[in-house]
């Protein structure tokens, strides 16, 4: 009798950890690590997740702490930090209102995390709290993603064909599919996602979620940063993933 396979739902933290280890995000991590080598320590990674970038920096001897709002992801990150005997402090905070016991020379926010804050007033408050964590002369780096491919080829609630990623170490195959709805006037994208994990040709894990994101135009974000008090705001296109899709890297300095 064939063994029955139980399909379990992946937690968000397990999903992110698996995806980072198996997908082509190495290019993204490499980019950030390369940029951060030019910056001063100590550093803080906001939205550190399970710690892919943080661990790379620690391995190079960079003094870097991590912060996230997801306790489960902080736990996975902390377990790895402890196992590798790295010296990083991790903070689990409420993104709506946070402060930390120290200041930093460099703060970076990867994964276009700011796009997940769909209210401009809340995004401004978040960035103000970040500003207050920087030393005078400190630098903020973060990236913003605008979904140009979805905007130019928009089909409401049409599911994309699944993108498959294979983990060469385990042979597991990860399939990601999504459909989206766009509010162009408010710059809001609502995404319904399905993540499937296959092993030996059989579905073994699945995760569904729905999320909203807001894209910020370059000059719009520049004005937000300058109104908070940042100076020397600059931005450049980075990490092109297709003819249309790319992220924009922002850098800004706190000068009092």
Role assignments for model-derived ranges:
Residues 110-112:
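Residues lining the SAM
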Residues 54-97:
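Class I SAM-dependent methyltransferase SAM/SAH-binding core
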Residues 124-136:
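A short glycine-rich, Lys/Arg-flanked "PGG" loop and its adjoining helix->strand segment in the class I
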Residues 142-219:
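SAM-dependent methyltransferase
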Residues 212-256:
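C-terminal lobe and adjacent flexible extensions of AdoMet/dcAdoMet transferase-like proteins
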Residues 47-49:
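Class I SAM-dependent methyltransferase "Motif I" SAM/SAH-binding loop
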Residues 99-107:
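A short acidic, Gly/Pro-enriched loop at the edge of an enzyme's catalytic core
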Residues 1-41, 52:
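Conserved class I S-adenosyl-L-methionine
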